[in-house]
C-alpha cells in the first residue's frame, strides 16, 4: 500500500481577497512560505520514521513525535485558518443559527464572546493561536489558547474557528501591533464556514 504525505492546499480565494485587512503580500508569504514549511517539516519527520522502521534503526521517539506534532499542528491549524476567513464584502458581522444561540448561551452575548476571543488572541504568549472549540461532553463552546502548534487531538473537543497570532501572520501589515491585527480579523471572519463546522457536529 502506497504511503501518502501532506501537500500544500490551494487557498479558497485569491491572494488579494482579504485586502485591506490582510494584504496580498502578507497572505502570499504566509501561505507559500510558512504553511509550506509545515508541510515540508511534517513530511520530513514521516520519512525519517518510515526509514527507521524499514531499516530497523533506532530513533529518538520523544523528539520525533514533538517535531511531528509541531509541524502537523501547524499544517492543520492553517487549514482551519484559511477556511474561516473570506472577502470582507461577503464576511464579517455576526453568526446566525445554532452557533449564535450557543454563543448567547455560553458567553451571554456576541460582544462578550468577541471581547474574550480577542483578549485570548492578544494575550497569547509569544507565538500561538486563539481557538474557538466545542466540547461535546459539556455541550459548551470554549475559547482556548494554543502555544506554538503543539496541539494534539483532545477527545470531545472540535475546532470551529482559529486566529493565527504568530508574528509571521501579521508583521508585514501591522508590524508588532497585534491588537490592530486582531481587530481587523473580525471583518473577514467567514461565519458561514464556522456555522457549518458547528452544525456538522449535530
UniProtKB/Swiss-Prot annotation:
Its EC number is 1.15.1.1. Keywords: Iron, Metal-binding, Oxidoreductase. Disulfide bonds: none annotated. Belongs to the iron/manganese superoxide dismutase family. This is Superoxide dismutase [Fe]. Binds 1 Fe cation per subunit. It catalyses: 2 superoxide + 2 H(+) = H2O2 + O2. Fe cation binds at residues 30, 78, 164, 168. PANTHER family: SUPEROXIDE DISMUTASE 2 (PTHR11404), SUPEROXIDE DISMUTASE [MN], MITOCHONDRIAL (PTHR11404:SF6). Homotetramer. It comes from Methanothermobacter marburgensis (strain ATCC BAA-927 / DSM 2133 / JCM 14651 / NBRC 100331 / OCM 82 / Marburg). GO terms for molecular function: metal ion binding; superoxide dismutase activity. The keyword Cell cycle does not apply. Its cofactor is Fe cation. Destroys superoxide anion radicals which are normally produced within the cells and which are toxic to biological systems. InterPro entries: Fe/Mn_Superoxide_Dismutase, Mn/Fe_SOD, Mn/Fe_SOD_BS, Mn/Fe_SOD_C, Mn/Fe_SOD_N, Mn/Fe_SOD_N_sf, SOD_C_sf.
Amino acid at each position: 500500500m502506497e504511503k501518502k504525505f501532506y501537500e500544500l492546499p490551494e487557498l479558497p480565494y485569491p491572494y488579494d481577497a482579504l485586502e485591506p485587512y490582510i494584504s496580498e503580500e502578507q497572505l502570499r508569504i504566509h501561505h507559500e512560505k510558512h504553511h509550506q514549511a509545515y508541510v515540508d517539516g511534517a513530511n520530513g519527520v514521516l520519512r525519517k520514521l518510515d526509514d527507521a522502521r524499514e531499516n530497523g534503526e533506532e530513533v529518538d521517539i520523544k523528539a520525533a513525535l514533538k517535531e511531528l506534532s509541531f509541524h502537523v499542528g501547524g499544517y492543520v491549524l492553517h487549514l482551519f485558518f484559511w477556511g474561516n476567513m473570506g472577502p470582507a464584502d461577503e464576511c464579517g458581522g455576526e453568526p446566525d443559527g445554532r452557533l449564535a444561540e450557543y454563543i448567547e448561551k455560553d458567553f451571554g452575548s456576541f460582544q462578550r464572546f468577541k471581547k474574550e476571543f480577542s483578549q485570548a488572541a492578544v494575550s497569547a504568549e509569544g507565538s500561538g493561536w486563539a481557538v474557538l472549540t466545542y466540547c461535546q461532553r459539556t455541550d459548551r463552546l470554549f475559547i482556548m489558547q494554543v502555544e506554538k502548534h503543539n496541539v494534539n487531538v483532545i477527545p470531545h473537543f472540535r475546532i470551529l474557528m482559529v486566529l493565527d497570532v504568530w508574528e509571521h501572520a501579521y508583521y508585514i501589515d501591522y508590524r508588532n501591533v497585534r491588537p490592530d491585527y486582531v481587530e481587523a480579523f473580525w471583518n473577514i471572519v467567514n461565519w458561514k464556514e464556522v456555522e457549518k463546522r458547528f452544525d456538522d457536529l449535530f
